[in-house]
Amino acid sequence: MLLTLAGGALFFPGLFALCTWALRRSQPGWSRTDCVMISTRLVSSVHAVLATGSGIVIIRSCDDVITGRHWLAREYVWFLIPYMIYDSYAMYLCEWCRTRDQNRAPSLTLRNFLSRNRLMITHHAVILFVLVPVAQRLRGDLGDFFVGCIFTAELSTPFVSLGRVLIQLKQQHTLLYKVNGILTLATFLSCRILLFPFMYWSYGRQQGLSLLQVPFSIPFYCNVANAFLVAPQIYWFCLLCRKAVRLFDTPQAKKDG
């Protein structure tokens, strides 16, 4: 545990510093803000690949969705804790870089950061203070399969990050941006929303239950927890859909005009 925590505490900030240094050396025309924001997205993508890979390994290794075990289901959670702390700081650093030319007081920058990122900060706090204790202690030796499923939700993150990078570089007009937008919607829908019916279906298949019977055959708090987890994902997916509609409507609107 301690070794994994220490490894994560060194790996993610170290990777961020390395990416920032490499970008400033290789792209001297980019501003410091560009380098910091893009480095943040690169680190997020690396974490997403590691989490998704861990999740797939866990899922494939668990023959029983309840009692199946794999060491990554616990060990990667310890690796995740330093990432969540690092990512919270990285988001604040991006806000500071974005507004540093405005000579704002640090307290005002912090308030704006908390205001602009309320949902994401809440998301990180829930993971650290609720999901980590559940995953590491409260669930006992059960449910590694479902922990692996939750890890695979990160599959959409590299596509989200690439979209943010393209926006930062003012490349919203490119074909790459549009294709990436479609992939973002597809992976977000499948891995962050449809993931939950898949977990219910997997449990039902093993227990001989239909998908509709599963919610009534598991503890009520499991349904409540899943509802709290999927609610922000649905909200974010709706925002992505609205953004996609605006993106693909713009050329048609200009043509009609």
UniProtKB/Swiss-Prot annotation:
It is found in: Cell membrane. The chain crosses the membrane at residues 1-21, 42-62, 77-97, 113-135, 142-162, 181-201, 220-240. Keywords: Cell membrane, Membrane, Transmembrane, Transmembrane helix. This is TLC domain-containing protein 3A. The keyword Transmembrane helix applies. Residues 33-249 form the TLC domain. One of its GO terms (biological process) is lipid homeostasis.
